[in-house]
Amino acid sequence: MVIAVLAVQGAFAEHEQMLGRLGIPYVELRKKEDLIQKYDGIVLPGGESTVQGKLLKELDMFDTLKQQIQEGMPVLATCAGLILLADSIENDDREYFKTLPVTVKRNAYGRQLGSFYVEQEFKGIGVIPMTFIRAPY
């Protein structure tokens, strides 16, 4: 099994780290030629959906990736990845893959500036680093 991770922008490194910890081989998708090989699934990471969509089109990856998803390639999508898949975006007229029959709302929980990081100590556990981000819904 080999999983592809869209690596043109966004939080792809975190997904790669987790796949690595699980012992799952992965490859980064950065250019059209990376889509020639067939993969067992793809991760569409969080990041900025408008930038990811623009880069996918500029790199001539958009149509091929959309076709592979339409043909049934399994997808794990987080944040911006969900927006790329959504059939409809409530507060944005841009369209991307439109392969998932859901409606999402961009920046539903606030802008990126509303995100923050904090370390909190929990009794009996210790200090836990926590990142709170805005996300679509």
Residue locations for each model-derived region?
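N-terminal beta1-alpha1 cap of cysteine-dependent amidohydrolase-like domains
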Residues: M1-E58, F62-E71
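A residue-level signal for conserved active-site and pocket-lining positions in enzyme catalytic cores
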Residues: I3, G110, I133
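Structural signal for conserved beta-strand scaffold positions within catalytic alpha/beta enzyme cores
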Residues: V5, E28, A77, K98-P101, ...
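C-terminal and late-domain segments of enzyme folds
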Residues: G10, S115, R134-Y137
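A conserved hydrophobic position in a structured secondary element of the catalytic/binding core
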Residues: L44-G47, A77-T78, I133
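Cysteine-nucleophile active-site neighborhood
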Residues: S49-Q120, G124
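Active-site oxyanion/phosphate-handling segment shared across diverse enzymes
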Residues: Q120-Y137
